[in-house]
From Swiss-Prot:
The keyword Nucleotide-binding does not apply. It comes from Aedes aegypti. It comes from the Eukaryota. It is found in: Nucleus. Component of the Cdk8 module of the Mediator complex. GO terms for molecular function: cyclin-dependent protein serine/threonine kinase regulator activity. This is Cyclin-C. The lineage of its organism: Eukaryota, Metazoa, Ecdysozoa, Arthropoda, Hexapoda.
Length: 265
């Protein structure tokens, strides 16, 4: 994506302070523990990923949709909009912004119905309840809350540059790319610039693959303390995954703060 990250709205408005993030969540954490809250977001990141794959979207589009989703709830309670409505809305908006091409409304709704029924029936007993008018209305609300800051810089491009600098390492690239996908289940996209996320994921991949690149990392002009924080956040989500049980998701969704039903017209 063209443009300079440092002059972008992503850098200037959407690299958030961790304390602000924690404070904004307090309303939801009256109903949920921190771990339960994180598991709900892992679940919806999975929903966005599967919807995106079914719609044959590029990973960049799926990642942007996930960041929109996380940004919305960084400033709003889960009770503001049902996450099951916001997830496909984020996909619709991301596909436009990333110039993937238009997803027809009917195809989006049909895909949501199929995915919820076939892949996530453990969480939802009912069929997907929303229609095109709900998604279009939700899109206006999402745009307003994102303050129309729609360009999202992802760690994939910095990763390709880093790998090129190291020397073509296919195995390292593949694993780090997957770790960047995993990082979407954490808060790092809200807290750190994408190049730091790429380096944090690369560092984990080097440990897993037993690649000795300490000297190369030492030459990087980067705040290694921040990189370590990113690596810890990703390793923490792996720990959380160990206790992530599909059977408990329905109970967590029932416990989650809910939007008030709209008044009958």
């Amino acid at each position: 994506m063209a443009g300079n990250f440092w002059q972008s709205s992503h850098h200037q408005q959407w690299i958030l302070d961790k304390q602000d993030l924690i404070r904004e969540r307090q309303h939801d954490l009256k109903n949920l523990t921190e771990e339960e809250y994180q598991k709900i977001f892992m679940f919806f990141a999975n929903v966005i990923q599967v919807l995106g794959e079914q719609l044959k979207l590029r990973q960049q589009v799926i990642a942007t949709a996930t960041v929109y989703f996380k940004r919305f709830y960084a400033r709003n309670s889960l009770k503001c909009i049902d996450p099951l409505l916001l997830a496909p809305t984020c996909i619709l908006l991301a596909s436009k912004v990333e110039e993937f091409g238009v997803i027809s409304n009917s195809r989006l709704i049909t895909t949501c119905q199929t995915v919820i029924k076939n892949k996530f029936s453990y969480a939802y007993q009912q069929e997907f309840p929303y229609r095109t008018n709900h998604i279009l209305e939700c899109e206006f609300y999402l745009l307003e809350n994102l303050d129309c800051c729609l360009i999202v810089y992802q760690p994939y491009r910095p990763l390709l540059q880093l790998i090129q600098d190291i020397g073509q390492e296919d195995q390292l690239l593949t694993l780090t790319w997957r770790l960047i996908n995993d990082s979407l289940r954490t808060d790092v996209s809200l807290l750190y610039p994408p190049y730091q996320i790429a380096i944090g994921c690369l560092q984990i991949a080097c440990v897993i693959l037993q690649k000795e690149l300490k000297a190369w990392f030492a030459e990087l002009n980067v705040d290694m303390e921040k990189v370590q924080e990113i690596a810890r956040a990703i390793l923490n989500v792996f720990e959380l995954w160990k206790s992530y049980d599909e059977k408990e998701i329905q109970g967590l969704l029932e416990k989650m703060p809910k939007p008030k039903p709209a008044p009958q017209r």
